[in-house]
Design a protein with these regions (language model features):
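N-terminal alpha-helical membrane-insertion module
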Residues: 1-78
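N-terminal topogenic membrane-targeting module
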Residues: 50-125
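"A position-specific structural signal for the A-helix of alpha-solenoid helical repeats
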Residues: 62-63, 92-102, 133-141, 169-181, ...
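Hydrophobic/aromatic side-chain positions at a characteristic register within alpha-helices
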Residues: 68-69, 105, 142-143, 182-186, ...
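Alpha-helical repeat scaffolds
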Residues: 76-84, 110-122, 146-164, 186-199, ...
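Residue signature of alpha-solenoid helical repeat architecture, marking inter-repeat boundaries
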Residues: 87-93, 128-131, 165-170, 201
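Extended amphipathic alpha-helical interaction segments
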Residues: 166-170, 176, 180-205
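Long, non-transmembrane cytosolic or organellar matrix-exposed soluble domains/tails
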Residues: 194-248
Length: 248
């Protein structure tokens, strides 16, 4: 089941709940003559609708999150972006735009990730959580796409970050330094060694950079053991392609 199928079910469930509510209210209105009982019945039905909508929304959000982040379903990613980038609600259009940054980063299209992130960051009144998210993706995309980047330039970029979430700010700085060490300076960095993540792409990312760290240390056996975990994964993903090159 992809995103479009989930969205169709969501629409069906919400409309069905609304229609059923209207039918029940009409039934109560015509069947119950006692006004207090009729009012109570209508309130119960409305409360039931509110609960149903809450449960439907919870199911929808968890299912979409699983498709995008746990299953890493490319079809769903593209459908999600295409469907929501022209949505009536501004928040959905913004979410689609930031999702495009994420997808570009995961597939190694760092130029697009950088361009899109800068475009969104230039908007007035951008919510803090999106600004934080985009700054994190932007600096990592720069590191991975500019092999000539100097450490001084990296430090300058990190000094310009305005991420307000302390945890994300620390993670972004440490990860950016680790990426620089491993991919540009070709120096060891153990940052990824203790990391875990419930989402699939970060899991694959951790595996690849642990393997790269092992290779730089000269531990070829461990590097190959880690890289075998990437075998069979979608080669549209940047770290999978890079892992294949490293395994040669």
């Amino acid at each position: 089941m992809d995103y479009q199928a989930v969205r169709k079910k969501y629409t069906l469930y919400t409309r069905g709940a609304g229609i059923l509510t209207m039918v029940l209210i009409l039934c109560v209105t015509f069947a119950v003559s006692d006004i207090p009982m009729r009012t109570g019945g209508v309130l119960v039905i409305v409360a039931g609708l509110a609960l149903a909508i809450y449960l439907i929304n919870k199911w929808y959000l968890s299912t979409v999150a699983k498709l995008l982040h746990i299953d890493l379903d490319f079809t769903s990613w593209k459908q999600y972006i295409e469907t929501n980038k022209e949505a009536k609600r501004a928040i959905l259009r913004l979410d689609a735009a930031t999702s495009e940054v994420s997808l570009s980063y995961m597939t190694g299209d760092f130029e697009t990730a950088i361009r899109k992130a800068k475009e969104i960051l230039s908007r007035d009144g951008l919510q803090v959580q999106y600004r934080n998210f985009l700054q994190s993706y932007l600096i990592r995309s720069v590191v991975l796409s500019q092999p000539e980047l100097s450490r001084e330039e990296l430090n300058e970029m990190m000094g310009e970050l305005t991420i307000t979430d302390p945890t994300l700010a620390e993670k972004t700085q440490k990860m950016s330094v680790a990426l620089y060490d491993l991919t540009i300076a070709h120096e060891t960095n153990d940052y990824f060694e203790t990391l875990t993540n419930e989402y699939k792409y970060p899991q694959l990312e951790i595996i690849y950079y642990k393997a790269l760290n092992a290779a730089i240390k000269g531990d070829t056996n461990r590097a190959h053991e880690l890289l075998r975990q990437l075998a069979g994964e979608d080669e549209r993903l940047y770290v999978v392609r890079m892992g294949k090159e490293l395994y040669k």
